[in-house]
């Protein structure tokens, strides 16, 4: 069969980029070929969600000789689409072994007032001649398909379908967050997943818009208007709510302390309110509530927890941060480091957590 008489599978889903130059047909009256080639090989990863037909196609092992002009005429007459004997009320005979094709043809032939894709996915049980086709189990099995297995129209999901109510593809429901018709009517899990993801992206976009006006408390520039991408980040302090750009707060904390200067009170404290913060969290967003700040900090720690610590070095090195390190302490066999804290009781009754104690620390304090 010529490719010009085979309906383009990309055109069926509204995604053909070749237009009039496509070698396949863009006429809905032509026969489609929606057999999944991956299913024939037994390796379709989409399963029931695949938009193509999962049917076994029998192959003739013998190779036919090149057809002549006379045999071509006989072959074309013998390759007419099959029908299972239903009355020709549609005006097109579809392949009975292709249930999705039967659905598409009936959807195209429907001329009711409601949208075509809103019709049921079965033929009418009683036709004009009074024959009840619903009593035939063979016909019913061949024409019944779960609506959840059908894809939605990509044109409608993108915002505008040129076919409107006459579109042969199913139209999705409206997502109130993104404003697109992209919610599948018969896939509740997929709808819920899209809604959560869409709300999360919308919330992030709103936070990004509000963060555009935040200025650094040191250089007084808008943080997200810095010239380079590396500078367009906030440096969040764990115990303070003053905004800083990441470069300014890091330069402040990396200054070498003078003799006799307390590092905690001089460098690790906020330049404005002097509150002590032991670490800085880089972020492209600024928070506007305590919950948002905790979410940013938790996401940052979770990301670092998946990165191996360069000081621990899979157990061959020593991390100076100990149990306070945000990075992963794991051995080469995948085992995580078992943290055992040593508690020391002081004379005043307080308890402190001891770090690694070495003999050289005591010997260095002796004046012999």
Swiss-Prot record:
Residues 175-202 are annotated as: Makorin-type Cys-His. Pathway: Protein modification; protein ubiquitination. A zinc finger (C3H1-type) spans 2-29, 30-57, 147-174, 303-332. Expressed in primary roots and leaves. Detected in vascular bundle tissues. Keywords: DNA-binding, Metal-binding, Repeat, Transferase, Ubl conjugation pathway, Zinc, Zinc-finger. GO terms for molecular function: DNA binding; ubiquitin protein ligase activity; zinc ion binding. One of its GO terms (biological process) is protein ubiquitination. Its EC number is 2.3.2.27. Residues 58-81 are annotated as: Disordered. A zinc finger (RING-type) spans 216-274. It is an enzyme of class 2 (transferase). Coiled coil: none annotated. Residues 69-78 have a biased composition (Low complexity). It catalyses: S-ubiquitinyl-[E2 ubiquitin-conjugating enzyme]-L-cysteine + [acceptor protein]-L-lysine = [E2 ubiquitin-conjugating enzyme]-L-cysteine + N(6)-ubiquitinyl-[acceptor protein]-L-lysine. PANTHER family: IP09428P-RELATED (PTHR11224:SF10), MAKORIN-RELATED (PTHR11224). E3 ubiquitin ligase catalyzing the covalent attachment of ubiquitin moieties onto substrate proteins. This is E3 ubiquitin-protein ligase makorin.
């Amino acid at each position: 069969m010529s490719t010009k008489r085979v309906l383009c599978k990309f055109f069926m889903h509204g995604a053909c980029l070749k237009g009039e130059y496509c070698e396949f047909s863009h006429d809905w009256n032509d026969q489609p070929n929606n057999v999944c080639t991956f299913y024939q090989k037994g390796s379709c990863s989409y399963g029931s969600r695949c938009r193509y037909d999962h049917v076994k196609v029998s192959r003739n092992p013998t190779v036919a000789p090149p057809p002549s002009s006379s045999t071509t005429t006989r072959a074309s007459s013998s390759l007419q689409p099959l029908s299972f004997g239903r009355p020709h009320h549609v005006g097109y005979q579809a392949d009975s072994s292709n249930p999705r094709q039967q659905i598409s043809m009936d959807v195209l032939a429907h001329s009711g007032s409601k949208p075509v894709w809103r019709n049921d996915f079965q033929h009418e049980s009683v036709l004009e001649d009074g024959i009840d086709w619903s009593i035939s189990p063979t016909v019913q099995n061949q024409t019944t398909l779960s609506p959840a297995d059908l894809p939605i129209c990509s044109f409608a999901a993108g915002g505008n379908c040129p076919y409107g109510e006459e579109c042969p593809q199913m139209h999705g429901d409206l997502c109130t967050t993104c404003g697109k018709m992209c919610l599948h009517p018969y896939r509740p899990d997929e709808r819920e997943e899209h809604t959560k993801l869409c709300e999360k992206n919308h919330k992030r976009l709103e936070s990004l818009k509000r963060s555009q006006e935040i200025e650094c408390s040191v250089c007084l520039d808008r943080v997200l208007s810095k010239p380079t991408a590396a500078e367009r980040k906030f440096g969040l302090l764990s115990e303070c709510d003053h905004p800083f750009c990441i470069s300014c707060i890091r330069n402040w904390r990396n200054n070498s302390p003078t003799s006799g200067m307390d590092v905690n009170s001089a460098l690790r404290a906020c330049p404005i309110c002097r509150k002590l913060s032991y670490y800085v969290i880089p972020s492209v967003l600024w928070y506007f509530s305590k919950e948002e700040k905790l979410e940013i900090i938790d996401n940052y720690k979770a990301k670092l927890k998946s990165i191996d610590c360069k000081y621990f070095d899979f157990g061959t090195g020593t991390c100076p941060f100990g149990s306070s390190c945000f990075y992963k302490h794991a051995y080469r066999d995948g085992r995580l480091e078992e943290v055992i804290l040593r508690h020391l009781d002081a004379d005043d009754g307080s308890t402190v957590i001891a770090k690694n104690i070495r003999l050289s620390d005591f010997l260095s304090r002796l004046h012999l």
